[in-house]
């Protein structure tokens, strides 16, 4: 139903995540053809503008779902001022978009809290972070999800049920 779409390239510490414009447009066309909703991955500000341009060209249908990826070396730092700026730009460019921020590694929990506070969605799990806290490894994805779910109450937020999540993301209901 969904797949990641990075709308530009980024220099990772040991390699280049290469996504030239013609490749990105081809992926967007294929996703549109097969009814796959892109999760726009934003590793730098230009990727947000690239996504807006793809939407203007009709290669991505709205409302978009955008994920800011914070805390990877050579990309966006996990700083609150950067997070706030990205949200501000998103609201100006794509006001109907849903959004989430992913904090990698030691930044995951802090970025989760920023998202809850600012009205965004939350991403958690072992793909981005192996630790439950500074003192120990997470036992499972479920443990990390439970940590975020428990935190929702403190921000007057609730955990979406699958049908609600599909609706929020603009996905067809599951059969």
Where are each of the predicted segments found?
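C-terminal helical cap(s) of enzyme catalytic domains, especially alpha/beta-barrels
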Residues: 133-157
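Short Asp/Glu-rich motifs
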Residues: 50, 134-135, 171-172
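Catalytic alpha/beta core domains of metabolic enzymes, predominantly
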Residues: 2-127, 138
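Substrate-binding groove of N-acetylhexosamine-processing glycoside hydrolases
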Residues: 89, 164-169
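Acidic/aromatic/glycine-rich contiguous surface patches that form carbohydrate-binding/processing clefts
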Residues: 145, 149, 167-173
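Flexible, glycine/charged-enriched surface loops at secondary-structure junctions
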Residues: 41, 155-164
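Positions that flank functional sites
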Residues: 46, 130, 167
């Amino acid at each position: 139903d969904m797949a990641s779409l990075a709308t530009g390239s980024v220099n990772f510490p040991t390699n280049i995540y290469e996504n030239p414009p013609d490749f990105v447009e081809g992926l967007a066309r294929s996703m549109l053809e097969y009814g796959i909703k892109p999760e726009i991955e934003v590793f730098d500000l230009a990727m947000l503008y690239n996504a807006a341009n793809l939407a203007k060209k009709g290669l991505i249908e709205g409302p978009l779902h955008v994920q800011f990826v914070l805390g990877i070396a050579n990309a966006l730092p996990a700083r609150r001022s950067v997070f706030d700026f990205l949200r501000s730009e998103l609201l100006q460019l794509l006001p109907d978009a849903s959004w989430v921020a992913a904090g990698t590694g030691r930044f995951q929990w802090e970025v989760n809290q920023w998202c809850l506070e600012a009205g965004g969605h939350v991403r958690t799990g072992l793909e981005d972070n192996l630790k439950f806290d500074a003192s120990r490894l997470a036992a499972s994805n479920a443990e990390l999800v439970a940590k975020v779910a428990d935190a929702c109450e403190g921000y007057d937020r609730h955990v979406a049920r699958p049908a609600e999540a599909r609706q929020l993301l603009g996905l067809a209901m599951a059969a």
